[in-house]
């Protein structure tokens, strides 16, 4: 499921929290490219890595849930006549990702890859509110994550 030709990607990686072990800019870019596949010839997006307080505040403001969450996606919606390659923003909570990886028995790298792919699919319009859409999204996520050599992210370890 790798793109035939690499997309022109501008990724603004913002690290707004302290962490001992984060993926590299190159890893984030490779996971974004994988998720975008051949959908867009070029894309601009931001990935912001945050602490629990910022995640909780954003989750409360935009989703009405007063707790931190692993990944929030904010798609960029431009008027139809404006052709910009702006995909949107992902906000990923570092402590939540680290805790989930440990609890679920996954490697931290595999879980980071999953969160980036999951968030990018949301930016592309995929959702998991309706069961049929959730199945389609999870199937695509699983294919992409397994193509990296990681196990199915939804399978119990």
From Swiss-Prot:
One of its GO terms (biological process) is rRNA processing. Pfam families: YbeY (PF02130). Keywords: Cytoplasm, Endonuclease, Hydrolase, Metal-binding, Nuclease, Ribosome biogenesis, rRNA processing, Zinc. SUPFAM superfamilies: Metalloproteases ('zincins'), catalytic domain. It is found in: Cytoplasm. Its EC number is 3.1.-.-. InterPro entries: MetalPrtase_cat_dom_sf_prd (IPR023091), YbeY (IPR002036), YbeY_CS (IPR020549). It is an enzyme of class 3 (hydrolase). Zn(2+) binds at residues 118, 122, 128. One of its GO terms (cellular component) is cytoplasm. Binds 1 zinc ion. GO terms for molecular function: metalloendopeptidase activity; RNA endonuclease activity; zinc ion binding. It comes from the Bacteria. Its cofactor is Zn(2+). Belongs to the endoribonuclease YbeY family. Single strand-specific metallo-endoribonuclease involved in late-stage 70S ribosome quality control and in maturation of the 3' terminus of the 16S rRNA. NCBIfam families: rRNA maturation RNase YbeY. This is Endoribonuclease YbeY. It comes from Shewanella loihica (strain ATCC BAA-1088 / PV-4). The lineage of its organism: Bacteria, Pseudomonadati, Pseudomonadota, Gammaproteobacteria, Alteromonadales.
